[in-house]
Design a protein with these regions (language model features):
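Short, surface-exposed beta-edge/turn micro-motifs
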Residues: 10, 37-39, 50-53, 111, ...
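Extracellular/luminal recognition modules and glycoprotein regions
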Residues: 23-81, 145-187, 207-209
Length: 211
């Protein structure tokens, strides 16, 4: 028994120091492309509308529309999926369980949060560092002007959406993604609106869990 404990302890020590066993978050999951036209990023009001958070709606089938985007800038979004049982038709990603930030092979979900900030002149989706404040804050998307209600957020150049994958299996989690860190970053915001979980389910559909 003593020999077993010694061997086990040595094994644990090697596992803790071996780079082959210490998987980075970005190396565990990969990404697959999505049809961006099937998605809309939305600044969605919380409560009485004094704050907002990021929602992402996905049109999975053509059975009936999941959302409607108005004309003009900023564009108002009608979340049609909230008026019917959209199981199998739409997906709705409402918090950090359903989406996260990724740059290249680096999964930044635990190091950055995606926050909707109303600057008074625009509505911005910011990627804000949560662990190291010296890291840059990045502007991911903008509404294009001041507005209230459900407002479309348009991705900045270089940003897109991709789906998380594990091996050959696509998962029910989206990445707000770009290939490399942008050269210019946004100044730090004094009071970002946190996109903390509000509802109970991150993806309202019968998708495979996102892990």
């Amino acid at each position: 028994m003593a020999r077993f404990r010694t061997v086990a302890a040595v094994g644990l020590a090697l596992a803790a120091t071996s780079p082959t066993t210490a998987f980075a978050q970005g190396s565990l999951f990969t990404t697959v492309p999505v049809e961006l036209n099937n998605f809309v990023l939305v600044s969605a009001p919380i409560g009485k509308g004094e704050r907002s958070q990021l929602n992402i709606y996905e049109q999975r089938t053509n059975k009936r529309p999941c959302f409607a985007v108005g004309t003009g800038v900023p564009a108002v979004v009608d979340p049609l999926l909230s008026t019917f049982d959209f199981t199998g038709i739409c997906n709705r990603y409402i918090d950090g369980n359903g989406y996260s930030l990724r740059i290249g092979g680096d999964d930044l979900g635990t190091r950055y949060r995606l926050s909707v900030v109303n600057t008074g002149r625009d509505i911005e989706l910011l990627a804000t560092p949560t662990r190291n404040p010296s890291q840059p804050t990045m502007v991911v998307a903008r509404a294009g002007g001041a507005a209230s209600g459900f407002i479309q957020l348009k991705l900045e150049p270089g940003w897109t959406l991709r789906r998380r994958a594990y091996g050959k299996k696509s998962l029910g989690h989206l990445y707000v993604y770009r290939d490399s860190t942008p050269v210019e970053s946004a100044p730090a915001q004094t009071d970002p609106i946190d996109s903390a979980p509000i509802d109970s389910a991150p993806v309202d559909s019968a998708l495979t869990p996102s892990y």
